[in-house]
A protein has these predicted regions:
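Short amphipathic alpha-helical segments
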Residues: 17-19, 66-70, 116-118, 133
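Conserved catalytic core of two-metal-ion nucleotidyltransferases
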Residues: 92-125
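Active-site nucleotide-donor binding segment shared across nucleotidyl transfer reactions
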Residues: 39-78
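Catalytic cores of NTP-dependent nucleotidyl/adenyl transfer enzymes across multiple folds
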Residues: 124, 128-193
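Short amphipathic alpha-helices in soluble, non-transmembrane regions
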Residues: 82-90
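Helical scaffold of the NTase/Pol beta-like nucleotidyltransferase catalytic core
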Residues: 1-52, 174
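Short glycine-aromatic motifs
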Residues: 46, 91-92
Length: 193
């Protein structure tokens, strides 16, 4: 009998779900829209602040892991636990939790990746550095291509170690996120409670 995904070690999960990249797929934007509408259909509007397509699949023209990253920002007055219960009820699986952050996935199966795979990043409003990085890459195609080249190199080196792959990109992401914050100033800093 096969182990359940939640009973697998990180090493077993990395074997089943290796890092792989593919050329940009124009359908990724539509998949994001469909999934964001689905999420809006089961989460009450007062529990949502904003949803965003983030990650490399949101950047046209660069290779990416074919996983749609969604940033779901909620008002600080909302209880993450109640949103977590709803997400689990509607097919999302927990990935990680830390102070004020939860991550979920959908599309991971015992046979490997499903056709459509999603990572949902649940955060309180204001924890959204990924938006600055995304916008900087969209506005600076040479930097986006540099990021793509870095990922292509790291892909084969860390194909079966997602944590190392992510860590190896961190300095690049931090550097350009800081540049973006200086350039775009307070682009995403609305005033909400």
């Amino acid at each position: 009998m096969a182990k359940a995904l939640e009973d697998m070690s990180l090493e077993e999960l990395w074997q089943l779900f290796p890092i792989f990249l593919e050329e940009h797929n124009k359908d990724w934007a539509a998949w994001y829209v469909e999934e964001s509408r689905r999420i809006q259909s089961f989460l009450p509007a007062n529990q949502l602040y904003k949803m965003h397509h983030i990650g490399s699949t949101s950047i046209e023209g660069i290779w990416a892991k074919p996983i749609i990253d969604i940033l779901l920002e909620i008002p600080r007055s909302e209880d993450m636990g109640s949103i977590k219960r709803k997400l689990l009820e509607y097919g999302y699986l927990p990935m990680s939790e830390s102070e004020g952050r939860m991550s979920f996935n959908k599309g991971y199966t015992l046979q490997g990746f499903a056709e459509r795979v999603f990572h949902l990043h649940l955060r309180y409003y204001g924890d959204h550095d990924e938006l600055y990085f995304r916008d900087y890459l969209k506005d600076h195609s040479a930097v986006a291509k540099d990021y793509e080249q870095l990922k292509l190199i790291l892909w084969k080196k860390y194909e079966y170690n997602r944590d190392a792959y992510t860590e190896a990109k961190t300095d690049f992401i931090r550097r350009y996120t800081q540049k973006a914050k200086k350039l775009y100033k307070r682009r995403y800093d609305d005033k909400i409670e």
